Amino acid sequence: MYIHYLKDLIGFKSVTPENDGAIEYIDDLLKQHGFKTEIKIFGDFKSEQVTNLYAIFGRNEPNICFVGHVDVVPVDNHALWHNSSPFKASKQDGKIYGRGAVDMKGAIACFLAASLDFIKNNAGFKGSISFLLTSDEEGKAKHGTKEMLQYIYDQGYKVDFAIVGEPTCEKEIGDTIKIGRRGSVNFKLNIDGLAGHVAYPHKANNPLPCLIKILHELTNIRLDEGTEFFQNSNLEVTNIDVGNETSNVIPASTEASFNIRFNNLHSAETLAKQVEEIIKRYCKEYKVDYKLEYSSFAGSFIQNPSAKIKEFAKVVEHTLKIKPKFSTSGGTSDARFVKNYCPLVEFGLLSETAHKINEYTKISDLQKLYDVYYNFLIKIL
């Protein structure tokens, strides 16, 4: 059934933060199989409103919760996709193509199939199975998982262990389980000099040489050497803007943006202090003024492998005959919200084609993921 569910889910044009009926489809399916469900819409303005779902079967402990998102990233060029339609699932050569196939409608489809089969085959099992789904993960992630978790806890629900279905595997299904994530901090730097004619540089103060020096040092600095589970922290320049359309004018100001993905040796605040010390030094040397702004929507985190995390890893190894590694690589995810409530693993399909043209998953990989999810429910419940 996971192929059927995935094809249906791909058919919803749920470009973040839109839901396009995907949540309602899952809600209806789970209701038909005895789940208690509730859809909540959060967001003050219509343009910000996000659709969320919590569904649970049973009320006993432990509550195993699948956390995921139905929203997908936008598609730029439909013509380059199979059948010219990223929102119409295409089955070719043992693969399912479509936007969201791996990130992360495929994992949702697998856990839907695994949980419904488990309930059918194991009447009277101990514990509970639940879903927490949102349409706001690929975007601002403001009114999705974060708010929904708080809401269900206010209603008296408690999650004992969560599986976040992000595409975590690298080369084959089962090779990677994520137990943490790097943090992310964005910087915007404005430097003000003095405009003038390029023929009279002594009557101006060009802010660009200062910016070049700053960015050169920032991009060459070694922030750390990494840790056991984290790669080294990394800074990337994402934008430089002068706003100068002519070649004979020294600009009055310049702006640069950069991002740091950091491990648990840092915080956004300590990095901002380190960055500003470098900026301040060069701006003083070049006699220019600056303004530095930074914002962080995600700090780094790492979990000590709990009993259930280790149990999940054993199920992966037993099911797929591959020993998974614990990792924290990649971008941010909603796991950063879930970890405040319960232990978790992030485990899903291969990440190779996520967000790409002709995103796809192998049907054989869907079967492997289904098997892991089903066998974990058997083991724990």
From Swiss-Prot:
Zn(2+) 1 binds at residues 69, 103, 166. It catalyses: N-succinyl-(2S,6S)-2,6-diaminopimelate + H2O = (2S,6S)-2,6-diaminopimelate + succinate. The active site is at 71, 137 (proton acceptor). Pathway: Amino-acid biosynthesis; L-lysine biosynthesis via DAP pathway; LL-2,6-diaminopimelate from (S)-tetrahydrodipicolinate (succinylase route): step 3/3. Its EC number is 3.5.1.18. PROSITE patterns: ARGE_DAPE_CPG2_2 (PS00759). GO terms for molecular function: acetylornithine deacetylase activity; cobalt ion binding; succinyl-diaminopimelate desuccinylase activity; zinc ion binding. The keyword Coiled coil does not apply. Zn(2+) 2 binds at residues 103, 138, 355. InterPro entries: ArgE/DapE_CS, Bact_exopeptidase_dim_dom, DapE_proteobac, Peptidase_M20, Peptidase_M20_dimer, Peptidase_M20A. CDD domains: M20_DapE_proteobac. Binds 2 Zn(2+) or Co(2+) ions per subunit. Keywords: Amino-acid biosynthesis, Cobalt, Diaminopimelate biosynthesis, Hydrolase, Lysine biosynthesis, Metal-binding, Zinc. Its cofactor is Zn(2+); Co(2+). The keyword Protease does not apply. SUPFAM superfamilies: Bacterial exopeptidase dimerisation domain, Zn-dependent exopeptidases. One of its GO terms (biological process) is lysine biosynthetic process via diaminopimelate. Catalyzes the hydrolysis of N-succinyl-L,L-diaminopimelic acid (SDAP), forming succinate and LL-2,6-diaminopimelate (DAP), an intermediate involved in the bacterial biosynthesis of lysine and meso-diaminopimelic acid, an essential component of bacterial cell walls. Belongs to the peptidase M20A family. DapE subfamily. Homodimer. PANTHER family: ACETYLORNITHINE DEACETYLASE, N-ACETYL-L-CITRULLINE DEACETYLASE. This is Succinyl-diaminopimelate desuccinylase. It comes from Rickettsia akari (strain Hartford). The gene is dapE.
